[in-house]
Regions:
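Active-site hotspot residues in diverse enzymes, especially metal/ion-binding acidic/histidine motifs
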Residues: 1-143
Length: 143
């Protein structure tokens, strides 16, 4: 499980600048400029030093690392595909499958317990469980 300082170190190593930027609706976003430089903007409301910040930062890093970007004119299915790529990257880094298997083997089986153990939100943990059990992020089909 990757901790918050390691996520910021990873961003720095990859030359991805993380900026304070007010984003009332989404909390965070990432952009790639024509030259390939990536930037992540995060609203102060999600920069809590904990769960929200880890989930938002890892998701936005997922966009940057996988190159999964879209614009406001993109079709909904295209947006979903890029969001899923970013989420899958984040899941693999915040909730590694081997660590999740260990947690379940130790009796940690409730979503809230798993979320607490891995330092993520319950909705993020739903995505992680869906991804590892069903191979997709369609939580609405399974929960």
């Amino acid at each position: 499980m990757v901790q918050l300082p390691a996520l910021y170190a990873y961003a720095s190593k990859e030359n991805i600048e993380v900026l304070d930027y007010p984003m009332e609706q989404t909390g965070s976003m990432s952009v790639m400029l024509e030259g390939g430089e990536c930037y992540i903007g995060m609203d102060s409301r999600v920069k809590d030093g904990g769960v929200k910040e880890r989930v938002h930062l890892s998701h936005e890093l997922g966009h940057c690392v996988t190159g999964s970007f879209y614009n406001i004119h993109a079709a909904v299915d295209c947006r979903r595909r890029h969001e899923n790529k970013a989420d899958k990257w984040a899941v693999r880094h915040l909730v590694p499958v081997a660590d999740l298997d260990d947690a379940v083997a130790e009796g940690c089986t409730e979503l809230w317990e798993l979320a607490e153990r891995f330092g993520v939100t319950e909705s993020f943990m739903r995505k992680a469980v869906c991804y590892y059990v069903h191979g997709n992020l369609a939580t609405e089909l399974y929960f």
